[in-house]
Amino acid sequence: MPIVRFFQHIIDLFVTLILWFYFLFGYLFILVFLYIPAYVFAENRTTAFQNLNHVHLKCFFALTRLLIPRTKFKIPKDVREIRSSIVICNHLSYLDPLLLVSLFQRQRTIVKHTFFQVPIFGWFLNNYGYISSGSGDMIGPAMINNLEAIKEHLASGGILFVFPEGTRSRDGNLLPFNKGVFTIARYCNAPLKLIFIKDTNKLFPPGHFLFNTRNFNEIQLELIGSLEPDYKGNNFSISAVADQARNLFEAKIAKIKSKETEKPSQVYRQK
C-alpha cells in the first residue's frame, strides 16, 4: 500500500539521518575532546588515532544494531582475531571499510586520492596513517616510505585491509583485481587473509542515500582462505597469487548463487 511504503521511507530517512549525524558530527566532537589531546600528547600519534577511529566506528555499528534490529551481524572469531596480515576483501557497500575499522583496532588501508582533499576528513586520513592511491604516493621515495610504514605496522600486530576491485560491485559479481596489494604483500613478506563480505549492500546499497531498515538481513564476514606465498621462491609470481585469491572469491560467490537457485526449486517441490 502506498501509505505503508510512505511511512517505511520516513523511518528509513529518520534512521539514516541519526546514523550519519553521529558519523559526521561524532568526528568533530571527538576531535575536540580526544583527537586534539592525542595529537599533542600521544607517543605514537598514528596508533592513537587508529584506536580512536576504531572506537568511534564500533559505537557507530552498535547504534546501527540498535536502530535497525532486523539486520544481524555474523562475524566469527577467526575473522576478529586476524593480526599482522594483509586482508583482502570483496567490496559491496560504503559500509565495508567502516565495518572493518570497527573490527580491527590497528588498521590501515589504501584510500582514493580525492578523499584526502576533503577538508577535515583528509586530515583524519593522513593522521590514521592511511595511504593515498594517488600516483604521486605510489612512486619513488613516497612509495618506499609508505611500504616501510606498512611493514612496521604489520610487524607490530596491525592489519592492512584492501579492496582489490577498487570500487563497489553493483551486482555482487567480482570486478577485475588490481595487483598492487600483492606487490605490497611481497615487499612486507606478509600473509594474506581473504575475507568474504556478504549483504552489506542490502543494508546500504550503492547509489542510495537511505539505509534499508525494513528487510530482514544478516551481514556476514567469512575467512575463506589464508595464503602464505613463498615470496622468495624462484617460481613466485604476483599474477599467480592474485589469480589464486580471485579463484577463492569466485568459488564462494558461485556457491552462494547455487544455494540461492536451489531454494525456489525446493519450495516448488514442497508445493
Placement of each model-derived feature along the sequence:
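A cross-family acyltransferase "interaction/gating" segment
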Residues: 121-122, 172-236
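Short gly/ser/thr-rich secondary-structure transition/capping motifs
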Residues: 66-74, 143-144, 204-207
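Long, non-transmembrane cytosolic or organellar matrix-exposed soluble domains/tails
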Residues: 214-271
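Membrane-anchoring hydrophobic helices of lipid-metabolizing enzymes
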Residues: 2-85
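Catalytic-site beta-strand/loop segments enriched in glycine and acidic/polar residues
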Residues: 153-182
